[in-house]
Amino acid sequence: MGQLSHINDEGTVRMVDTSDKPVTTRLAVASARVLMSPETVAAVQQHRTPKGDPLEAARLAGIMAAKRTAELIPLCHPLPLTHVDVQATIQDYGVYLESAVSTNAQTGVEMEALTAVSVAALTIYDMCKALDKGIVISELRLERKTGGKSGDFLRTPE
């Protein structure tokens, strides 16, 4: 395992200096699952949720969150995002969320992709909690990333 880049020689946290890194195209894809009762899944499918369409609200919230990641996560660089897409798909267990975030920058967008699906999942919870207090947000993870010094990453199927 390599050295942590956010820790300086004195052992305190710091924002990584990316000044000397080249600008490259970066992409990150993250996902999460929102587990809910079959009755709640049916309500989402049939547009019978009290606060409106949770899938559309989640997509918008995820896009907005990706753009504000540097304000939420300490030491993240503010990045000029070139694209953010959040998809919400109804499954038999609940909702599968996936975000894709890209930029041309000196550092990656993994945190932006993870933040997008995290906030999208929280939004679905908020929009459906009146119907189901037992909703679970699970399997938040990076699926793949491209670009940058550390190379590409692709999660292997389980």
Residue ranges and their predicted role:
Residues M1-L55, L60-H77, L81-E158:
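C-terminal binding/interaction regions
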